[in-house]
Amino acid sequence: MEYKSSPKRPYLLRAYYDWLVDNSFTPYLVVDATYLGVNVPVEYVKDGQIVLNLSASATGNLQLTNDFIQFNARFKGVSRELYIPMGAALAIYARENGDGVMFEPEEIYDELNIEPDTEQPTGFYEAVDKPKKREEKKKTKSVSHLRIVD
């Protein structure tokens, strides 16, 4: 019987994050911006990746869960809410000396990065604020059944 363990990535990410912060390093996160569900400022994406500063001074409401990383950050003075599924986290390292870790591929994250067969909103924002427009029925002119009587 094969034992299925939970993914290592969230635990390693949190451990390295804590170690970097405890040693006064600036934690940088490398993100696969093409991964399904990623919400980052696309104007800063380069070669499908973005590097994000996770320091306390650069982020607000930072959450490092087993499934995702979420926080607020400012880009050119504009506040943005970022959402990174754990499968999109590629590496975490210190800005000052590059010390850190690249995460090994894990099968579960490959499975989660597959587009669903049916089109569904990816989040509450899309479902509520950007509803799909209903296709309007095209009105066709029909010949009137009325006629002019003299």
UniProtKB/Swiss-Prot annotation:
What is the documented function of this protein? Enhances recognition of ssrA-tagged proteins by the ClpX-ClpP protease; the ssrA degradation tag (AANDENYALAA) is added trans-translationally to proteins that are stalled on the ribosome, freeing the ribosome and targeting stalled peptides for degradation. SspB activates the ATPase activity of ClpX. Seems to act in concert with SspA in the regulation of several proteins during exponential and stationary-phase growth.
Concerning SUPFAM superfamilies, the annotation shows: SspB-like
Quaternary organization: Homodimer.
Biased amino acid composition, Basic and acidic residues: 127-138
Similarity field: Belongs to the SspB family.
Write down the Gene3D superfamilies for this protein, in alphabetical order: SspB-like (2.30.30.220)
Q: What is this protein called?
A: Stringent starvation protein B homolog
Note the InterPro entries from the entry.
SspB, SspB-like_sf
What's an example GO cellular component term for this entry?
ribosome
Gene Ontology terms describing biological process: positive regulation of protein catabolic process
Query: Coding gene?
Result: sspB
